Regions:
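A beta-strand signature from Gram-negative outer-membrane beta-barrel systems
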Residues: 1-12, 80-82, 101-103
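Conserved alpha/beta core surface patches that mediate binding of polyanionic ligands
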Residues: 79-83, 333-337, 458
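Extended, hydrophobic alpha-helical segments in both membrane/secreted and soluble proteins
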Residues: 119-121, 228, 268-270, 335-341, ...
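Solvent-exposed loop/turn segments connecting transmembrane beta-strands
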Residues: 77-80, 108-110, 361-367
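Outer-membrane beta-barrel initiation region
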Residues: 24, 43, 73-77, 87-91, ...
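Outer-membrane beta-barrel architecture
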Residues: 10, 86-88, 99, 122, ...
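Transmembrane beta-strand segments that form the barrel wall of outer-membrane beta-barrel proteins
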Residues: 13, 100-106, 351-360
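Surface-exposed loop/interface segments of Gram-negative outer-membrane beta-barrel transport/assembly proteins
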Residues: 4-68, 108-114, 118-209, 229-335, ...
Length: 459
């Protein structure tokens, strides 16, 4: 949050241009050089480039036609815009901080770009000398536009890669026909016009995201703090990838792949902290707490082939073979209880211990809970009295050791369920086990020892 007092407003703006580092035109031959190279190659091989009946016909007149600079056709100067507005301040026991930002980037390849908008608001207020509360709100929008290299996967040899097509295509090859339509007689790039492929495709991802947190903190005495944090995070994403028929090498014509997904995370965290210093020598910090979170995500995806290129959207009137639909839902939850205690004496001797118990819905009903702990100790030798004479040289000397057991739940949400899949055998449909049930599936545990020495000289 901001500071109590006079409000402060800050505005920032930035604009930039990006270009391709191209000091020598990528070493590419111009039209005259290319024609001369082709003619010399034919002559050196014993052929006559001026014989119109020969398949090696390549007359000098080719140098007089209009040249195509494919690299310039496939790229552009990129641009960057950034704007930000910040307001902060406060009055009395209340402080605030708000910001609004916008970013837009146009890439050096046409149709490639990035757009992002964010808004943020923080508010803190002291209700009385024992109680304070606050909130953190954040909302955002993001759009990423790209070019899909669907012809050859993500290979660098895809026609939509301007650095490949710009160098593979000769300056004698036309980008457009005389009637203004795209020229597809381009065998070096699989007869796909890269200009058309980049401009006529449509690929983007849009995301709207919100994150909100509210906290309440109660401090009945100086050493004791009760705090609760409660938050929600929600995001929804829309994706679209359309490829015209001339981009796809398969027989399914124009294709469209769209998807919508969203996720939600609810979290509550509640802690009690005791922090005190006794007789100026003994420091003690104890924290106990509880945390719970619930996660849910879902998606819906549709894929269509032989899409109407005049109206490139899904249609319910097409055959089943031309459409694919899929959806999914994932849910998981975790509950944790934990405690941490730290003690140090005169900044010389430190001990720390922690323990936590976690329950995860990812595991089987018989083994969902796991208990993990850690302990550590360290000795700041340089703070001892016998080290004072050399403290100006040896600025730090610490011995430390720790041991801990931690858990890992990084598995799929439904790995402990028994699952069946459809199967056809000898013309008869049935089901076959595809995943065995495991009620005892549980946490992966890792034990770690650490021992070390920290020192610093002449600082």
């Amino acid at each position: 949050s901001g500071e109590s007092g006079k409000s402060k407003i800050t505005a920032r703006a930035r604009y930039g241009v990006s270009t391709i580092a191209n000091d020598n035109d990528f070493g590419m031959a111009n039209l005259e050089e290319y024609v001369q190279y082709q003619r010399d190659a034919r002559i050196n091989a014993g052929y006559n480039p001026d014989d119109p009946t020969s398949e090696y016909y390549f007359p000098q007149a080719m140098a007089g036609r209009r040249a195509t600079n494919w690299m310039k056709e496939l790229t552009r100067n990129g641009s960057l815009q950034e704007y930000e507005l910040i307001a902060s301040g406060g009055a009395g026991k209340t402080t605030y901080y708000t910001s609004l930002s916008y970013n837009k980037t146009n890439g050096i390849v046409p149709t490639v770009g990035f757009e992002k908008m964010q808004i943020r608001a923080n508010l803190d207020t002291e209700l009385n000398k024992w109680l304070k509360m606050g909130t953190r709100l954040h909302g955002g929008y993001m759009k990423v536009s790209d070019v899909q290299n669907s012809l050859l996967g993500d290979s660098g040899l895809a026609p939509t890669n301007p650095f490949y097509s710009g160098m593979a295509l000769a300056p004698t090859m036309n980008a457009y026909n005389e009637d203004g339509s795209y020229n597809f007689d381009l065998p070096f790039v699989f007869n796909v016009n890269p200009i058309a492929a980049i401009r006529e495709q449509d690929k983007y991802d849009k995301q709207y995201k919100f994150n909100g947190t509210v906290y309440l903190e109660w401090k009945p005495i100086k050493q004791l703090t009760f705090r609760t944090n409660n938050s929600i995070e929600y995001a929804t994403t829309t994706s679209r990838a359309y490829s015209p028929a001339f981009v796809n090498t398969a027989s399914y014509g124009a294709s469209l792949n769209t998807a919508e997904s969203q996720y939600r995370i609810l979290t509550t965290s509640n802690t009690i902290t005791y922090d005190d210093l006794f007789n100026d020598d003994h420091s003690l910090n104890v924290l106990i707490g509880q945390e719970a979170n619930a996660y849910e995500s879902s998606f819906l995806q549709g894929i269509s082939y032989h899409v109407n290129q005049q109206r490139p959207y899904h249609s319910v009137g097409v055959s089943v073979e031309d459409q694919r639909v899929g959806d999914g839902l994932t849910e998981m939850a975790m509950v944790s209880f934990f405690g941490v205690a730290e003690y140090n004496y005169k900044g010389r001797y430190y001990v720390k211990g922690s323990i936590r118990t976690d329950g995860s819905s990812k595991f089987g009903p018989d083994k969902r809970w796991g208990t993990f702990w850690a302990a550590s100790a360290s000795w700041n030798i340089h703070n001892e009295d016998f080290m004072q004479d050399i403290k100006s040289v040896l600025n730090q000397l610490k011995l430390r050791y720790s041991y801990g057991v931690n858990g890992n739940d990084n598995i799929a949400s439904y790995a402990h369920y028994g699952l069946y899949s459809d199967v056809v055998y000898n013309g008869i449909t049935g089901q076959l086990p595809s995943q065995l049930q495991n009620r005892k599936l549980t946490w992966e545990t890792n034990k770690t020892h650490n021992i070390g020495i920290d020192f610093r000289l002449f600082d």
